[in-house]
A protein has these predicted regions:
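Glutamate identity and glutamate-enriched acidic tracts
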Residues: 1, 48, 54, 132, ...
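Acidic, proline/glycine-enriched N-terminal capping motif
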Residues: 2-106, 111
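Acidic, low-complexity central loop/insert segments
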Residues: 114-175
Length: 175
């Protein structure tokens, strides 16, 4: 954590914007105090004055990103696997509990609607993340199935560790 006097004060978030669970800790690290709206949240545009080092880190090493503004859905029930296998491009039935799959989903003509992750939490228990709201679309595709779909976006903060050295870094800090 930086403590020099050149660190700007954290942004005052307008009342109309929410903050992520990580905002209080990371807001002072945003050097230019440049923010953007993301799904109703105040999100850092970049932490340094330019994107150069952040881009290089995610392409050649690792970067930790606050992705709390993503939409998150809990999908449970006897047909949860069947629903997800219907709507995403990955074979969700092959995922093990605790495994996360990156995937996309398409409309009836094969056009990509969105992408995100599916985490298998249990036998018929999943969490799906997406950049765009997908609740209505999920319900339409679940018609006639034994499945419960719950939006849990505001209940969970989320961090994404990405980059070619991310698995090694995670293993080093989690053992």
């Amino acid at each position: 954590q930086r403590t020099d006097r050149s660190t700007p004060p954290p942004m005052r978030v307008p009342h109309s914007l929410k903050t992520t669970p990580f905002h209080a800790r990371t807001a002072r690290l945003v050097q230019g105090q440049t923010w953007r709206r993301w799904s109703g949240y105040a999100a850092a545009s970049c932490y340094e004055f330019t994107h150069d080092r952040e881009y290089a880190a995610i392409r050649s090493a690792a970067a930790l990103i606050d992705v709390s503004p993503l939409f998150k859905y809990r999908i449970t029930g006897a047909d949860a696997t069947r629903l997800l296998d219907r709507v995403v491009t990955r074979d969700v039935s092959k995922a093990r509990p605790g495994q996360v799959l990156y995937t996309s989903w398409c409309d009836g003509h094969g056009k990509v609607i969105d992408d995100g992750t599916v985490c298998r939490l249990g036998e018929q228990d999943y969490r799906l993340t997406s950049a765009e709201p997908s609740l209505r679309w999920l319900h339409r595709n679940a018609f006639g199935m034994q499945v419960a779909i719950e939006e849990i976006s505001e209940a969970l903060g989320a961090l994404a560790l990405q980059g070619p050295t991310s698995a090694r870094l995670l293993a080093a800090v989690s053992d």
